Amino acid sequence: MSDEEHHFESKADAGASKTFPQQAGTIRKNGYIVIKNRPCKVMEVSTSKTGKHGHAKCHFVGIDIFNGKKLEDIVPSSHNCDVPHVNRTDYQLIDISEDGFVSLLTETGNTKDDLRLPTDENLLSQIKDGFAEGKDLVVSVMSAMGEERICSLKDIGPKN
């Protein structure tokens, strides 16, 4: 055994699964589901009765949490669906670069520089205007299935 120290900086999620299985019949409105390989928030669920040939079916209508597109899927209620691990994290906004990336302060005091400004015009203008006015802004970043996007903004007062 050597006395050397080994330092690892984790940039990956250690191969953890981006989704978990859940029975279709137990997924409810406002939950999450993967439809056509996209993480979606469930807006509507309707269940059809068991037919002559087989299972009751669940009809899901979801909105992609990153691009806002409406997606639909029909799954037998006894089958498993993929449900994305969705995380929401708040970061303080430090800077906006000219190429459209933001610089964010993490809880540990490090910076996160790999996120683009949001494409939503309303949110984009709120962030740019608030930053230009020198306000202290906190952005919420939603992450699921290897994607991250700024989804909301909080003003925590003027900078001192």
Curated annotation (Swiss-Prot):
It comes from the Eukaryota. One of its GO terms (biological process) is positive regulation of translational termination. The modification Hypusine is found at K52. Pfam families: eIF-5a, IF5A-like_N. Signal peptide: none annotated. NCBIfam families: eIF_5A. This is Eukaryotic translation initiation factor 5A. It comes from Manihot esculenta (Cassava).
